[in-house]
Design a protein with these regions (language model features):
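Beta-strand elements of repeat-based all-beta scaffolds
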Residues: 1-16, 21-125, 129-203, 207-244
Length: 244
């Protein structure tokens, strides 16, 4: 190889793990001799059925012979979520906060409500934007995302607790006309194939995107229906399987 050819750049990295095998520290040596260091802290909580290992803090630093500069820090606090079975519980995020190097809050998410499966049903970002999630299929999939409405407003529009929808499997009739009952909100709806994935997504403007799958559960196309009733293909997938 000629001397002036570019040689492969080697970047030394180190990984450290805690006693449970989780990554606790990752460092990368820069060309100027400084290092970028990511540190991870976890906590253990007894969830009734077993021990939960939960991320509680993350920091990103620049270190060197004469420096140790904090660039970013994230923290997570947790609250207890009680399942439908009174003997079961688990811990779910309550507040997720991101700080810059000076300790100033850059972003905060508050998880104010959850369903019996531990899914978040209300998230507030930076004390302002409310997003409500309605779940179905026994808590497996979100069936609606609602922006610019509070948990109580959505509950009034539904005529029931938003979290209660999670325990239904099929489409809940209370979702019909929800956008009209929340005119200032942005409501998105989702339906699902039992053994594949999302089958439809209806945007706040009422336009619906449909998703079709083959017998193996692979997405073959997504489309909308035009005003003339014809399909408007958005994505079309062809799969070529070798040795099958």
């Amino acid at each position: 190889m000629p001397d002036n050819d570019m040689k492969a750049l080697q970047v030394p990295e180190w990984y450290e793990y805690d006693k449970d095998g989780y990554l606790s520290r990752h460092s990368v040596l820069k060309s100027d001799g400084d290092s970028l260091v990511d540190s991870y802290t976890r906590i253990h909580r007894n969830a009734g059925y077993g021990i939960q290992v939960l991320p509680s803090e993350y920091s990103h630093r620049m270190t060197g012979s004469d420096k140790n500069i904090l660039l970013k820090r994230d923290t997570v606090s947790y609250s207890v979520c009680q399942s439908a079975n009174a003997s079961d519980r688990w811990y779910v995020p309550q507040v997720v906060t991101s700080f810059d190097g000076s300790g100033k809050v850059q972003n905060m998410k508050e998880y104010l409500h959850c369903d019996v499966y531990g899914n978040p049903t209300e998230i507030v970002t930076n004390h302002s934007e409310h997003i409500i999630y309605l779940w179905g299929y026994y808590g497996k999939h979100p069936v609606s995302q609602i922006k610019n409405a509070t948990y109580s407003e959505v509950g009034s529009a539904l005529g029931k607790s938003p979290a209660s929808l999670s325990q239904a499997y099929s489409y809940d009739s209370s979702l019909a006309g929800l956008q009209a009952r929340l005119p200032k909100a942005q409501v998105t709806f989702y339906t699902y194939h039992p053994y594949a994935g999302i089958s439809s997504e209806t945007a706040p403007d009422g336009k619906t995107t449909y998703y079709d799958y083959d017998a193996k559960g692979w997405l073959i196309k997504s489309y909308r229906t035009g005003e003339n009733g014809k399909q408007e293909i958005l994505q079309l997938n062809n799969y070529h399987i070798i040795n099958e």
